[in-house]
């Protein structure tokens, strides 16, 4: 009897790792324009110069107000000042008066104050994010100090 033995064999194949190369879409580059110039970012006219720092952004993320040199740091710190119990401002005196009323009366007074405030015809002021601050005076002072 002939015995045929079947064996197994392992074949190892080394594959080179594949490299994916991305290319930009073909844009119409004129012959006079170099490739480095064609890849520069181009800002539209409505893009905001963020706080005169020549950092272009499409949206304003925060409102920056430069500190005034005339400001006294002691005036800016309210913790050093004592507050008297008899306030002359109308908002705090109204809230002091509210302590005399029950919750329904306070609610009615709040509604009435809101209606009075809404009746006053004042022009709609733009949101701080809707306008670009004017730093021309700030620039003049900074240039004068140089």
UniProtKB/Swiss-Prot annotation:
Any one GO molecular-function label of the UniProt entry: protein phosphatase 1 binding
Basic residues bias locations: 107-120
Chief place where the protein resides: nucleus
Renumbered residue ranges of the record's region Disordered: 23-146
InterPro entries in alphabetical order: PPI_Ypi1 (IPR011107)
Keyword Nucleus in record: yes
Family: Belongs to the YPI1 family.
PANTHER family: E3 UBIQUITIN-PROTEIN LIGASE PPP1R11, E3 UBIQUITIN-PROTEIN LIGASE PPP1R11-RELATED
Entry protein name: Type 1 phosphatases regulator YPI1
Species for this entry: Candida glabrata (strain ATCC 2001 / BCRC 20586 / JCM 3761 / NBRC 0622 / NRRL Y-65 / CBS 138)
């Amino acid at each position: 009897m002939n015995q045929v033995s079947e064996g197994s064999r392992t074949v190892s194949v080394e594959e080179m790792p594949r490299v994916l190369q991305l290319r930009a879409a073909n844009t119409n580059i004129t012959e006079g324009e170099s490739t480095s110039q064609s890849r520069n970012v181009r800002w539209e006219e409505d893009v905001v110069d963020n706080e005169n720092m020549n950092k272009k952004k499409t949206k304003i993320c925060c409102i920056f107000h430069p500190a005034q040199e005339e400001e006294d740091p002691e005036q800016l710190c309210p913790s050093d000042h004592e507050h008297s119990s008899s306030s002359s401002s109308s908002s705090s005196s109204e809230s002091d008066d509210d302590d005399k009323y029950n919750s329904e009366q306070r609610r009615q007074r709040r509604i009435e104050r809101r209606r009075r405030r809404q009746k006053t015809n004042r022009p709609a002021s733009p949101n701080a994010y809707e306008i670009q601050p004017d730093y021309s005076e700030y620039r003049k002072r900074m240039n004068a100090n140089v």
